[in-house]
Amino acid sequence: MPVADTSQLTSGVAERYASSLFELALEHGAVDSVTADLDRFQAMLDESAELKRFVASPVFSAEDQLKAIVAISERAGISGFFANFLKVVARNRRLFALPGMIRAFRLIAANHRGEISAEVISAHALSQAQETELKAALKSVTGKDVTISVTVDPSILGGLIVKVGSRQIDTSLRTKLSTLKLALKEVG
């Protein structure tokens, strides 16, 4: 069952929640542990289609979402600020915005460290060598250290889509084929 695109709606919510979590973690010197828990939870989201559907679905009650999030957090070894944060998000029925909250937290943390964060979409998982090479290329362009967040999307067919701040570089095969298709329509 497709879920409506709520990306525009959630960006403000996600940024506010992420900012609150970051400020709390910074105040208590727990940014690294929150980041580790956040990464662990993101890995679970990436690996589980059921968890993605659960997070995005408005069908479950706040109580059911809270119980599930508590169980998932305990099983994954997520505790402290991030576990409490997940409970608040579930209680407030904002789990649908969780992926945006994770992205926003990473951006805030990277900015705090003087780094630039880049979102990378690839058709296939990147090797460590490819990630290192991409970071070096982005550092040479931006002049700052770059942290990258890689998302795998087979629908782009090949190449990469790289988003750094308000700039986007799209070298995906899908875009190149679309451009070629348009060019052929104009000729024909």
Curated annotation (Swiss-Prot):
Source domain of life: Bacteria
Recorded name of the encoding gene: atpH
GO molecular function: proton-transporting ATP synthase activity, rotational mechanism
Quaternary organization: F-type ATPases have 2 components, F(1) - the catalytic core - and F(0) - the membrane proton channel. F(1) has five subunits: alpha(3), beta(3), gamma(1), delta(1), epsilon(1). F(0) has three main subunits: a(1), b(2) and c(10-14). The alpha and beta chains form an alternating ring which encloses part of the gamma chain. F(1) is attached to F(0) by a central stalk formed by the gamma and epsilon chains, while a peripheral stalk is formed by the delta and b chains.
Subcellular location: Cell inner membrane
Bilayer topology term: Peripheral membrane protein
Record-level GO cellular component terms: plasma membrane; proton-transporting ATP synthase complex
Protein name from the UniProt record: ATP synthase subunit delta
Presence of keyword Ribosomal protein: no
